[in-house]
């Protein structure tokens, strides 16, 4: 079951464009998740040096725009160029890269403090759960102090992008937490 199938179950006014921003540190698995969502081969994924955008027709004339922005330190200052009109923020964490948890915490904290993203639901994919040394989603919740987030809708989802495990559960959460489209 791919992203389209999950979203077909989500009732939304026709003509809606759902914009998802996919962020995280380099090598977290963002592009692999994007490729899984669009049912593409994930065997030969290369690091994103700028951004990838996939537009997927979901149901009727509903369009999904998933923006995958590179996570290298040199690219992160440009993340703010993509904050406008975001329906959901997905932050991907390499659960096996425990040495970088402090860096992840800083970057996620800056995103959560961003005014343009203040009311945007946040899904945190705790990726690479297929590795035996990966931190659990509970451990990541503690390390990143996610339980302190009281003024925002958020969810952490354990996943393995490579094995396509947990991704649909996360996207189902995204679909159930989308705000109704505003009337123009």
Swiss-Prot record:
One cellular component term (GO) for this entry is: Golgi apparatus
Q: Which Pfam families match?
A: Arf
Q: Which Gene3D superfamilies match?
A: P-loop containing nucleotide triphosphate hydrolases
Q: What is its main location?
A: Golgi
Lipidated residues (N-myristoyl glycine):
2
Keyword Acetylation included in the entry's annotation: no
Q: Kindly list the GO molecular function terms attached to this UniProt entry.
A: GTP binding; GTPase activity
Presence of keyword Disulfide bond: no
Keywords, alphabetical? ER-Golgi transport, Golgi apparatus, GTP-binding, Lipoprotein, Myristate, Nucleotide-binding, Protein transport, Transport
Report the InterPro entries cross-referenced here: ARL2/3, P-loop_NTPase, Small_GTP-bd, Small_GTPase_ARF/SAR
Q: Which GO terms describe its biological process?
A: cilium assembly; protein transport; vesicle-mediated transport
Name the source's superkingdom.
Eukaryota
* UniProt cross-references to CDD domains, sorted A to Z: Arl3
- Binding-site residues, GTP: 24-31, 68-72, 127-130
Query: Which subcellular locations apply to this protein?
Result: Golgi apparatus
State the protein's purpose.
GTP-binding protein that may be involved in protein trafficking; may modulate vesicle budding and uncoating within the Golgi apparatus.
Q: Hey, which family's this protein in?
A: Belongs to the small GTPase superfamily. Arf family.
What is the protein's name according to its record?
ADP-ribosylation factor-like protein 3
Taxonomic classification, please?
Eukaryota, Metazoa, Ecdysozoa, Nematoda, Chromadorea
